């Protein structure tokens, strides 16, 4: 994917950059794999805001993605590489030999006409899916399962990848994008390769309006609020009241650990930095 700069004909366009999308196919999305997507605006079932800074944005339809890759030993051909408004990565439409169609996350190097396969006999090439037990050490992977059969959960965003470091008994040791080293059952599946659309992080939106098109609302600082809205609100001038940075509910932030202990902690070999 290339990045295109626009002429600075206005303040909003001065730093704008766009993706060129030359690797995408000029086709309509597969209708059988589309679902209506209703927006919540960050509200829960009772109508209260539980996730701030969400709302608005362009109307979308959800693309059903095959994260489980459970159609084994049936070859599939890549019919198209498409844009997905619901994620930073691109998606690939697969047509299986038996006629079924499915979307998967498109890795780097996958192009229209390529053949992909799921199973123990699959080659180590981008787009193929195998169990960790069948992969050589050092393999770069994405869409990795945490529990066998649950579907890929790790490394699904644009440009992300995981490296298979070691195998010990019933578990494999992975190096995650956060630099965390974690053990995962060796029977879990993963897809070979790095997630595509690597230049996504280099895009500059250029203006607040493009952020709103994505469904993201303004992020207001606590010190800019009134005392009734935030512990750091109010005061004369830019004062924080003398307390350390915290959330609207008084929980310390900026480095404060909030992760609760859980049984799966024993699977973490080395915590992220």
Swiss-Prot record:
Pfam families: Ribosomal_L2, Ribosomal_L2_C. Residues 222-273 are annotated as: Disordered. One of its GO terms (molecular function) is transferase activity. One of its GO terms (cellular component) is large ribosomal subunit. Residues 264-273 have a biased composition (Basic and acidic residues). GO terms for biological process: cytoplasmic translation. Keywords: Ribonucleoprotein, Ribosomal protein, RNA-binding, rRNA-binding. Part of the 50S ribosomal subunit. Forms a bridge to the 30S subunit in the 70S ribosome. HAMAP family: Ribosomal_uL2_B. One of the primary rRNA binding proteins. Required for association of the 30S and 50S subunits to form the 70S ribosome, for tRNA binding and peptide bond formation. It has been suggested to have peptidyltransferase activity; this is somewhat controversial. Makes several contacts with the 16S rRNA in the 70S ribosome. Belongs to the universal ribosomal protein uL2 family. This is Large ribosomal subunit protein uL2. It comes from Syntrophobacter fumaroxidans (strain DSM 10017 / MPOB).
């Amino acid at each position: 994917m290339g990045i295109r700069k626009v002429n600075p004909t206005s303040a909003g366009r001065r730093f704008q950059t766009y993706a060129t999308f030359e690797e995408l196919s000029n086709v309509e999305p597969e209708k059988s794999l589309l679902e209506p997507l209703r927006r919540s605006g960050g509200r829960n079932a009772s109508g209260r805001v539980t996730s701030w800074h969400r709302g608005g944005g362009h109307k979308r339809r959800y693309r059903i993605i095959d994260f489980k890759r459970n159609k084994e030993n049936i070859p599939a051909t890549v019919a198209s590489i498409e844009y997905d408004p619901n994620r930073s990565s691109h998606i690939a439409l697969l047509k299986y030999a038996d006629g079924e169609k499915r979307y998967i996350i498109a890795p780097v190097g996958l192009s229209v006409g390529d053949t992909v396969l799921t199973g123990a006999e699959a080659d180590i090439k981008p787009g193929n899916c195998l169990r960790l037990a069948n992969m050589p050490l050092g393999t770069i992977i994405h869409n990795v399962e945490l529990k066998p059969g649950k579907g890929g959960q790790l490394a699904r965003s644009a440009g992300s990848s995981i490296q298979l470091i070691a195998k010990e008994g019933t578990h494999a040791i992975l190096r995650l994008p956060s630099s965390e080293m974690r053990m995962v059952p060796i029977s879990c599946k993963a897809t070979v390769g790095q997630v595509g659309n690597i230049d996504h992080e280099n895009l500059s939106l250029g203006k607040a309006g493009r952020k709103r098109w994505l469904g993201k609302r303004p992020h207001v600082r606590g010190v800019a609020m009134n005392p009734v809205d935030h512990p750091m609100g109010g005061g004369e001038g830019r004062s924080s009241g003398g307390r350390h940075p915290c959330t609207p509910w008084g929980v310390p932030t900026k480095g404060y650990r909030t992760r609760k202990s859980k049984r799966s902690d024993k699977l973490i070999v080395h915590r992220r930095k």
